[in-house]
Amino acid sequence: MDHLPIFCQLRHRDCLLVGGGDVAERKARLLLEAGARLTVNALAFDPQFNVWAQEGMLTLVQGEFDESLLDTCWLTIAATDDDDVNQRVSDACEIRRIFCNVVDAPKEASFIMPSIIDRSPLMVAVSSGGTSPVLARLLREKLEAILPQHLGQVARYAGQLRARVKTTFATIGERRRFWEKFFVNDRLAQSLANQDQQAVEETTERLLTEPLNHRGEVVLVGAGPGDAGLLTLKGLQQIQQADIVVYDRLVSDDIMNLVRRDADRVFVGKRAGYHCVPQEEINQILLREALKGKRVVRLKGGDPFIFGRGGEELETLCNAGVPFSVVPGITAASGCSAYSGIPLTHRDYAQSVRLVTGHLKTGSELDWHNLAAEKQTLVFYMGLNQAATIQEKLLEHGMQHDMPVALVENGTAITQRVVSGVLTQLGELAKQVESPALIVVGRVVELREKLNWFSNH
């Protein structure tokens, strides 16, 4: 370990910043946010420094570097564009045993500034030891995406509750189990973010009074159409908090690699015409695991409320009184069409879009007359095995023979493949495609020739 990571208490303590340009301005913001009593020494100052000085937030000393300013300092930053000046500052601090950061010169500095994720009072610092600031920044961005914005409010509220929790729960084990439930309670976090004090108090009271082995909860999460980059931030947060993840065939390996490492995984692979695990059994798995007190994530491809049977699964939980929530996902129609260069609506071609299941229960029938109407786009989910029937019915009800169609296989994935033609070819085209696949019918398919961006990447 080349550097010891520490957090400094600078509130009301003298700090010196040497430099008055844009880099120095960024450092000044950090020091002011930390509550430092800041003096800035430079030949010239960017306008923002004058604003801060007029507001009494810092003191400006114009001129050459003045070593006497170090006499009362706890910490110094050298942020000029003159290497010689920066070196003088560093040397002077070394003699006085004052920690000094030299911007863009980690070898001359006695401390370095990390990339910061600020969820005060929770702080996360990321550093490459000065060897690769860009890498540290990229890691910080990933952590920013994972950590909810309201996490600081939750941490502050936890601090207010510590004494009460200690008197409520007698043992360390009980207190630990309480805090584990507390920090993953979405209802509490959302109430704090919304400043809904009544909801905060009600949720807190329930957490403090219910048995620690109380039933868990189920979160229904839409994984999106395949590309892991299309998973929502909230979806990512949920799969990284799960005790158990119940997932199906449409969830990509890339997304499963993001799941919390020690979470149990239950595969309930499903596809049109074949169910590895019957739907009722899936419902019972969710119920059984939640009743054990676990945080269960039901991870489904696309959006769970669009042909995902999410409603059926939640009805079972609702009837049993198990708490649940839903995180929407990007549905396959949206993701696959975007990655295929096919806009679902267009002023010249389609004023509406219809999402249709091609996998119907026995005896079900679609309104083919309205589906064959002009100026709309049809997207058939799970329609591959019914492609010939879809072709026949649409033609029978008046759709034009030359209506463009596209079949998108493995949409949004690196292995995505798009086969296109006209309606009279749909049944034959389907024989060239493997599941999972989506069928798009409409004049908007013609735009693919110009708008197909993904295959060029």
Swiss-Prot record:
Active site residues of this protein: D248 (proton acceptor), K270 (proton donor)
Binding site residues for S-adenosyl-L-methionine: P225, G301, G302, D303, I306, T331, A332, M382, G411
A biological process term (GO) from this entry: siroheme biosynthetic process
Region listing for Uroporphyrinogen-III C-methyltransferase, in residue ranges: 216-457
Binding site for NAD(+): D22, V23, L43, A44
Pathway: Cofactor biosynthesis; adenosylcobalamin biosynthesis; precorrin-2 from uroporphyrinogen III: step 1/1; Cofactor biosynthesis; adenosylcobalamin biosynthesis; sirohydrochlorin from precorrin-2: step 1/1; Porphyrin-containing compound metabolism; siroheme biosynthesis; precorrin-2 from uroporphyrinogen III: step 1/1; Porphyrin-containing compound metabolism; siroheme biosynthesis; siroheme from sirohydrochlorin: step 1/1
SUPFAM superfamilies associated with the record: NAD(P)-binding Rossmann-fold domains, Siroheme synthase middle domains-like, Tetrapyrrole methylase
CDD domains, sorted: SUMT
Chain spans, region Precorrin-2 dehydrogenase /sirohydrochlorin ferrochelatase: 1-204
Keywords: Cobalamin biosynthesis, Lyase, Methyltransferase, Multifunctional enzyme, NAD, Oxidoreductase, Phosphoprotein, Porphyrin biosynthesis, S-adenosyl-L-methionine, Transferase
Keyword Transmembrane helix: no
Pfam entry (one): NAD_binding_7
Reactions this protein catalyses: uroporphyrinogen III + 2 S-adenosyl-L-methionine = precorrin-2 + 2 S-adenosyl-L-homocysteine + H(+); precorrin-2 + NAD(+) = sirohydrochlorin + NADH + 2 H(+); siroheme + 2 H(+) = sirohydrochlorin + Fe(2+)
EC number: 2.1.1.107, 1.3.1.76, 4.99.1.4
Top-rank taxon: Bacteria
One MF term in the entry's GO annotations: NAD binding
Chain positions found as Phosphoserine: S128
Family matches, as NCBIfam families: cobA_cysG_Cterm, cysG_Nterm, PRK06136.1, PRK10637.1
Described function: Then it catalyzes the NAD-dependent ring dehydrogenation of precorrin-2 to yield sirohydrochlorin. Finally, it catalyzes the ferrochelation of sirohydrochlorin to yield siroheme.
Family, per entry: In the N-terminal section; belongs to the precorrin-2 dehydrogenase / sirohydrochlorin ferrochelatase family.
PANTHER family, alphabetized: SIROHEME SYNTHASE, SIROHEME SYNTHASE-RELATED
The protein, known as: Siroheme synthase
Organism whose genome encodes this protein: Enterobacter sp. (strain 638)
Gene name of the record: cysG
